[in-house]
């Protein structure tokens, strides 16, 4: 559903932020 899609998008964004902090470009 819509809520699940939003949650997945936010989770992916959060994961990207964490990855950037762990491996700075």
Swiss-Prot record:
Subcellular location, principal: secreted
Whether Secreted counts among this entry's keywords is: yes
The cross-references to Pfam families, in alphabetical order and at most eight, read:
Antimicrobial24 (PF16049)
Where it sits in the cell: the answer is: Secreted
Q: Name one GO cellular component term.
A: extracellular region
An example GO biological process term is: defense response to bacterium
Provide the tissue specificity: Expressed by the skin parotoid and/or rostral glands.
Q: What protein family is recorded?
A: Belongs to the frog skin active peptide (FSAP) family. Caerin subfamily.
Q: What does this protein do?
A: Antibacterial peptide, that adopts an alpha helical conformation which can disrupt bacterial membranes. Each caerin displays a different antimicrobial specificity.
> Per its record, how is this protein called by name?
Caerin-2.5
Species of origin reads: Ranoidea gilleni
